[in-house]
Structures are given as C-alpha cells and as structure tokens.
Amino acid sequence: MERSRLKTIIILILAMMNLALALSLGLRLYQGRAAETALLTELRERFTAEGCALPENIPTEAPPMVVTMERDSGREQAMAEAILGGGTEYIDQGGGISVYRNGSGQATFRAGGSFSVTLRLPDGEATPMEQAEQRSRAFARAAGFETPTLLSGSGSAAQRYGGYPVSGAGASFSLRGSTLTAEGSYLSSAYLTKTEGPAMSAATALTRFLDFRSQSGAVIAEVTEISLCYLPRSTASAPMVLSPAWRIATDSGNYLVSCADGSVSRG
C-alpha cells in the first residue's frame, strides 16, 4: 500500500516537473517571438525613415550549416564524358588544373571550381541545336545543375545545395555553328563535414544592409525579397567551404550579406 502511494506521488511529481518545463519553454518561445516582432517593427520604421520599402514577409528561418567539401575528380570525369562523350584522355596540368579531351573537344576543371568546355558537334541525324540541348542537359545532370534550356543558341543553368542556391555557381552554354561551349563554376567537391555557423537572422542581415546603403550612397528604394543562399569559398590548396548568406533582392539589383562576418557585396 505504502509502495503504491509512493509510486503515485513520484508520478505526480514527474508530471508537475514536465508541466513546469513545458510552461517554461512556452514562455521562452513567446518571449522570443515577441522580441522578434518588436525588432521587425523597429526595423520597418527605420527603413521607412530611410526611404526604403520592405516586403510584407520577412523570413524567420535560421541559416543552414556551414559545409566543407573536398574535390571529387571522379565527378569531374563524369561531367566531361557527359558532354564530350566517351574515350576521354586525362591530363594533369598541375596547379590544380585537370583536362579531359577526346577527338571532339576538351573540358578543363580548376581547383577553385571553375570550368570551361569546347566541343565540336559531329555531323549526324540530329541538328546541332538538338545535340547541344542533349549534351548540355547531360552535363548539367552530372554537375548537379538545374536543367538548362537553349534559346537562340544560348542558355544557362544554376546550382543548388541542400535546396539553397549557390551564389556564383552555374553554367552558361553557347552554340555557334557546330561548336558548343560551356563555362562557369560548380561545386567540384564531395561532402566532407558540416558545422554550425553564425546564426544571423534576416532582421540582422537587413540592418547590416541598411547600414551599407547609407554608407555607400547606393540608390535603393525597395527591397523586394529576402532569401537564404550559399557562398562558396575555395583555393587551390584548401577544401571548398559553403557559408550561408542572405540574398537581398532590390529594385537596383541583388546584394549578399554574409552570415560569417556580416559583409555586404553585390550578388
């Protein structure tokens, strides 16, 4: 009997502790949202005073993790063969430069992630435009780009990682006669590690952006959209690092606010 009563008391104590914890978490969440609402209200007032409009919706999501990657030569070979065809010869030119070539053309990859391709399309049943479309899309799939569409002989494809666009990463394609060229930059790497990065909110990024606008004298009347993206950083001797950033679209172009150091740049 005493044991049963003691057990009941323990259960009640645990239930009360869980309830107290839930109330504490709920209070913190409420206080956090209230503080965020107050910050956004203050931010809108400041932008209005500076003569710059903000969109109705300002994101509240946290930036993604920082991603460190290492170069993947196997992926570069797959990209080269996707656009050049099989039978490629590999040449290590040193300095982080890799070349794949065959009788049709050449693909060059550099340690920083940039690439260039020149290809002479063969005569066949398909027209040069049809061949260019097919090879460009095969190259984009191998690189992890979005699907390109060639209009009037030219097109482009962007790249995403983890659902976020990667600033500066993508490809442009051009067809002149029977010669197809491609150039751009991509994530020439395989996943290595993920780490927590600076948790910069959209509101903080907008504050940094407004300071930049005031100091630089840039003529910007409206912010049209705010979204997260990745900024790639790499050298010939160090792994590629993807750092989160806020992309701020305005009526005079796009700007990037780095979550790592708060710096603002054109994007």
Residue ranges of predicted features:
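Generic marker of "main functional regions" within proteins
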Residues: 33, 39, 50, 57, ...
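N-terminal trafficking/processing presequences and adjacent post-cleavage segments
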Residues: 103-126, 180-205
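Extracytoplasmic/luminal low-complexity segments enriched in Pro/Gly and acidic/polar residues
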Residues: 179, 187-267
